[in-house]
Regions:
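Short, hydrophobic transmembrane alpha-helix segments
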Residues: 1-3, 25, 64-67
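Membrane-helix exit/interface motif
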Residues: 55-64, 68
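Membrane-interface helix-loop junction between the first two transmembrane segments
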Residues: 17-38
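Cytosolic/stromal cytosol-facing helical appendages immediately following the last transmembrane segment
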Residues: 5, 115-120, 166-297
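Central hydrophobic cores of alpha-helical transmembrane segments in multi-pass inner-membrane proteins
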Residues: 11-23, 57-58, 83-89
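Hydrophobic transmembrane alpha-helical segments in integral membrane proteins
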Residues: 1-12
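Membrane-embedded catalytic scaffold of the fatty acid hydroxylase/desaturase
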Residues: 44-53, 68, 72-224
């Protein structure tokens, strides 16, 4: 148990090659060489930092587990509860990673590709665990989930999320689309289109988005990437670009609280209006739509 993602590497490789073949022979342009290599290098680097933090994280969870409220058996209902607890937490980690710039600085890596394919799933942060995102899961050992099983559930979630990074699958039967995260739902999440920004955070289940008001169906075909793309294939720049911009913003920002906002406010925050957050961009889009509709009356 624990990190079982290594066992999935052959599956990752085979399916990536299959999708690449579909892209080449179907002339669908899912892949470009530089983008794919950048994604793969980011994935390898992520494995290194994840392994570096694995023992530390397991140690923290083990200490917390010694104060557990109850013993949750890892059979039957206990396994179901584990997966639901992990998925619920993953939703909020993901949502926070889009709404708090400190965490976005790591997560932005995963959204930095302007393509959407299985290699994009492997484009992972080098700083996510180092930034302390694992603390969101600290409640689970305190409740009574064994640490090794918490790590296992996280691996299961990552493996599930791999296959939804594809354009080769359009939509699935409606009951599946209603309950689970699917390629269609996740394509929306990777879009840079204003109406799609900060939507569909779900990991395995999409029901959390439906419950908490962050769900949107795929309508128009998404344009992938960031609101302002970083336009580089350099792995070091991909990994650390946003951290560098944060440091620059903090350095030049006037006043202590403004400096804090550049770290912890939503991405796009600026004290002088030079940049815009998702909320601001979407508010402008709504006003523009209302104005256009009014002009037609």
């Amino acid at each position: 148990m624990g990190d079982i993602t290594n066992y999935a590497i052959p599956f990752f490789a085979l399916t990536l090659l299959l999708e690449l073949g579909i892209s080449i022979y179907g002339k669908r342009k899912y892949y470009t060489n530089k983008d794919t290599w950048a994604s793969l290098i980011m994935g390898v680097g992520s494995i290194g930092t994840t392994l570096l933090m694995k023992g530390f994280k397991f140690g923290i969870f083990t200490v917390l587990y010694s104060f557990k409220a109850v013993d949750i058996p890892m059979v039957g209902w206990g396994l179901v509860a584990l997966l639901l607890a992990d998925d619920f937490t993953a939703y909020w980690v993901h949502r926070t990673s889009h709404r708090v710039r400190y965490f976005w600085a790591s997560h932005v890596v995963h959204h930095s590709s302007t393509h959407y394919n299985l290699s994009t799933a492997l484009r992972q942060t080098w700083t996510g665990e180092l930034s302390g995102s694992f603390w969101f899961y600290a409640w689970m050992p305190l409740v009574g989930f064994p640490p090794i099983w918490i790590l296992t559930a996280g691996s299961v979630s990552l493996i599930y999320q791999y296959w939804i990074h594809t354009e080769a699958i359009k939509t699935l039967p409606s009951p599946i689309e209603f309950i689970f995260n699917t390629p269609s739902h996740h394509r929306v999440h990777h879009s840079r289109d204003v109406k799609y920004l900060d939507k569909n955070y779900g990991a395995i289940l999409i029901v959390w988005d439906r419950i908490f008001g962050t769900f949107i169906n795929e309508e128009d075909h998404p344009e992938y990437g960031l609101v302002e793309n970083i336009d580089t294939y350099n792995p070091l720049r991909i990994a650390f670009a946003e951290w560098g911009v944060i440091l620059k913003d903090v350095w030049i920002a006037p006043g202590f609280f403004t400096k804090l906002k550049y770290v912890f406010a939503p991405p796009g925050y600026s004290h002088d209006g030079s940049r815009k957050t998702t909320d601001q961009l979407q508010a402008e889009a709504r006003l523009k739509k209302v104005a256009e509709q009014s002009g037609k009356l």
